[in-house]
Amino acid sequence: MISPRIMFTRRSAPYWATFLVIVLAALWLLWIGREPICTCGSVKLWHGETMSSESSQHIADWYTPSHVIHGLVFYAALWLVAPRLSFGWRLAIATLVESAWEIVENSDAIIERYRAVTISLDYYGDSVLNSVSDILAMVLGFVLAARLPVWASVAIVIGFEALTTWLIRDGLALNVLMLLWPLEAVRGWQAAL
């Protein structure tokens, strides 16, 4: 049997904190009324249809790369502003920020904002499964950024943005643009897909 003193060490504390943040985010999302899984009753590893009521309801979709990008960007930002913090604590902070975003993104105000200014007319918020998967995609991006050379991280960001812009006419940059400063020309271009 593993001793609790071995499992809960000073070195493992940030990873337990990261895990706890993810669990608390999932519980909060359930508490505010988010569906645990897609109301269609199934769980898919991949759902590639963006103009669908099942979008943002399954494990991965075309918006998953945006969350990987979050991880890459959070790693770079925390490396710059908190270089003395351990990798584990920087990961915990990044997970807290990503979890906070998932909670805000799934608030009624933001859901209505998406529906009002973007082409996401069928968007009713993420399932809890999708939100947790998005957080884990951010963790993946964070770990990749720690292991890869800077040029590779930059290439991933550019590649994912180019890929999603080309295939679904959306991505992290366009999503932020349309949420904060909606442009009718962009909305029309996205709707023409």
From Swiss-Prot:
Q: How does it sit in the membrane?
A: Multi-pass membrane protein
Supply the alphabetized keyword list.
Cell membrane, Membrane, Transmembrane, Transmembrane helix
Alphabetical list of Pfam families matching this protein: DUF2585
List cellular component terms (GO): plasma membrane
Principal subcellular localisation of the protein = membrane
Q: Does the keyword Cell membrane apply?
A: yes
Where are the bilayer-spanning segments? 13-33, 62-82, 148-168, 172-192
Q: Where does this polypeptide localize?
A: Cell membrane
Q: List the disulfide bonds.
A: none
Which family, according to UniProt? Belongs to the UPF0314 family.
Know the name of this protein? UPF0314 protein Pden_1914
